[in-house]
């Protein structure tokens, strides 16, 4: 994947996360979202955080959550965990739901 393709796809991930947080906040969720360059920080009511950031040199998107640190690469049309193969948005949904104590869904 070229650098341009990576940036286009990775920025789309960040935009989708932002849209998903907005949708969750339209419901019962209370998630604070802060963007600083290519880093998104999601802060939940209980003070826990999830950080999503881009890693251009490695062409990856990373998640840091209570469950640990996870690296995702674009493979066969989806961002996949480099160890487990889990899809990015499904994994982020699980991490956020666990940390928020309520269902919070993320999608592309």
From Swiss-Prot:
Gene3D superfamilies: Frataxin/CyaY. Pfam families: Frataxin_Cyay. GO terms for cellular component: cytosol. Transmembrane segments: none annotated. One of its GO terms (biological process) is iron-sulfur cluster assembly. InterPro entries: CyaY, Frataxin/CyaY, Frataxin/CyaY_sf, Frataxin_CS. Involved in iron-sulfur (Fe-S) cluster assembly. May act as a regulator of Fe-S biogenesis. HAMAP family: CyaY. This is Iron-sulfur cluster assembly protein CyaY.
């Amino acid at each position: 994947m070229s650098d341009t393709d990576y940036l286009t796809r990775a920025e789309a991930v960040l935009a989708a996360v932002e849209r998903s947080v907005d949708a969750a906040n339209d419901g019962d969720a209370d998630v604070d979202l802060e963007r600083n360059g290519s880093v998104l920080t999601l802060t939940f009511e209980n003070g826990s955080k999830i950080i999503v950031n881009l890693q251009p040199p490695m062409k990856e998107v990373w998640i840091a959550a209570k469950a640990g640190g996870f690296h995702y690469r674009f493979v066969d049309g989806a961002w996949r965990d480099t160890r487990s193969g889990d899809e990015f948005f499904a994994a982020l949904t699980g991490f956020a739901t666990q940390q928020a104590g309520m269902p919070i869904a993320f999608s592309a």
